[in-house]
Amino acid sequence: YEIRLSLVGSEMCIRDRALCDTIAYAKSKGMFVITDGKRNDIGTTMEAYATAHLGHTDVAGESIDAFGADALTVNGYLGTDGIKPLAKICDSDDKGIFVLVKTSNPSSGELQDMKLETNESVYEHMGKMCEGWGEDLMGKHGYSAVGAVVGATYPEQLGEMRTKLPHTFFLVPGYGAQGGGADDVKNAFDENGLGAIINSSRGIMCAWKKQGLTEDDFAVAARKEAERMRDEIVGCIGKIKLG
């Protein structure tokens, strides 16, 4: 379950309360919760972000979760100085991060596709850095706590990055409302059909509109669309596993 921080609320106290309540509710239902905050900073400021979103805070001698998400989207443009504080929390609290690598928006190529002196693109180099940052945070299934955001709207690059980043779990936006489909996301998965989370926000939240229903039918429509999405993607993963 991904929570887009910018849409939770504009008033800080209301937003923070809503974020805490939403995360707590989702986790009570057994969901893995990702906060889409795209945080980036360095030093003590990033330590504060990391602690707030993923770690524990001491209050009157008691250690409590601030927000308590399982993972956080982050911007790696500040380099290792911005990732180290997050990696520390990932290690101590069994949490994860997803670094922006090749994003789904139309103008992402203005910077991310630029070629470096090594003849690799900026997004390829960022992906390589994710692999390096995750070397000491490897899980039992071969994936590290440092994941990558790679968009479904660029299926060719998505497939290339899956091959180049064998230990990096992908968060894949762009499915649904942004135009990505099951055939576009299938290459995000490894040979076992693992290694990726496919995200659809508006496609599920606004499914009642597409289905010609009313706001009162929001939950029914959202469930129906989520199940349709699941079946469609699983069908494509099956094709991969069968050759």
Name what the model sees in each region.
Residues 185-191, 206-242:
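C-terminal helical cap(s) of enzyme catalytic domains, especially alpha/beta-barrels
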Residues 41-146:
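Conserved anion-binding
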